[in-house]
């Protein structure tokens, strides 16, 4: 402590600075005889101003904020209950009428259909069996990116919710275990699904292994070839893995015939998985993103994030998530969006998507098929067209032509923003993050990192001390081919032209709303 005791330090007890002398005598004189100074530390604590106490508390924020097990969410949050403008209903692809529960149950598990159609209940209880499973890897940490802040020399405070501490290496296990639980409860033999980068397929494989279910995975062909070890992890858990489009389904044969040499897409893989599910008794289709039920399960991310922030009285200014189909983004923002919808708080929410697959930023808000084969229900969403096949970029989990109907409605209502970024810029951010934070991020997650860094640098220019929270959805240890391409200068930034997108948009189904 300085020999000078400023007016700011002793508050109302001092009217001016005093001459240099012993700290204890100064404090004793100015605080009066009724105050017994035990030590230098006690004296300083007693005279801290409110501002300084806040600063002191901020210094106590740990690098990682963990919740206790008993603080984990006991119910999922259903943001649709608080939406004034509800997402448009799924439509039967043949009749263009709203899908009934009975129709949906031919494809999905019955309990999941009930969750899909529930627009009223704000909270849905998490079954105890699922909560017990969550304890294997949850709660996940909310990390203060002190090292990244220092590297950027920004006044912004950066936090990230890290979802990579489980066998799938991502957030996907949050919904996989829930969907496998309901399939087992229904007495099914097994499930089918699609996977892009492989995290969802890995998560579902593990969940099915846990509950003793058969698991058939159709993996987007470019990822199947780029990430051979990811498919081997799925096989460790007993799943069968097929590159999509394949020659095992009628849809796959048709797509291969129409697009020779295609690298596939999530839309293709969905079509194949649905075909196999409906043709085989005792099977149902489950999915890793897009639909309401998945965003519901992923709300554990946002609920934990908010609880961790509340522990330290932290209110974020900006919340950022990568966006492919919307599962991670929807889960991360859900409780914050709920507050925004109810008028209790305001946040700036940013979706980040690849420039090669810009559903939000360049797509149309319209009804479209959820799959390339046009066998799934029609959903009203931001879409590039169901037959749009993105370039073979290295963010396989974001290569989807559409977007969650929930997020699409929120975006259309002006409640969130969206930006698209080129993959070379994404990998620059990924490498910068890895070198200071010690985690090799997945390419998908790195889209959010790119936007978070950009926002932090804006704060550096303006001097604003904004609090930024982003979702680090998973790790990139199976994405080394992508990192190799980046380091060797072999990574391209393909961006579809307006003419290309117009051609796909012209093929959107005509629906009378």
Residue ranges and their predicted role:
Residues 175, 183-222, 315-329, 349, ...:
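A short, small-residue-rich loop immediately preceding and capping a beta-strand
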Residues 178-188, 202-214, 235-236, 333-343, ...:
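Alpha-helix C-terminal capping segments
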Residues 192, 200-263, 359-371, 480-488:
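Active-site-proximal loop->helix
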Residues 3-12, 16-17, 26-33, 37-42, ...:
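N-terminal amphipathic/hydrophobic targeting modules at extreme N-termini
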Residues 162-173, 191-200, 320-325, 353, ...:
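Active-site nucleophile and cofactor-binding loops and adjacent substrate-binding regions
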Residues 323-331, 423-488:
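Claisen-condensing/thiolase-fold acyl-transfer catalytic domains that form or cleave C-C bonds
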Residues 123-125, 255-293, 301, 313, ...:
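Active-site/ligand-binding loops adjacent to catalytic centers
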Residues 60-188:
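Positively charged, low-complexity intrinsically disordered leader regions
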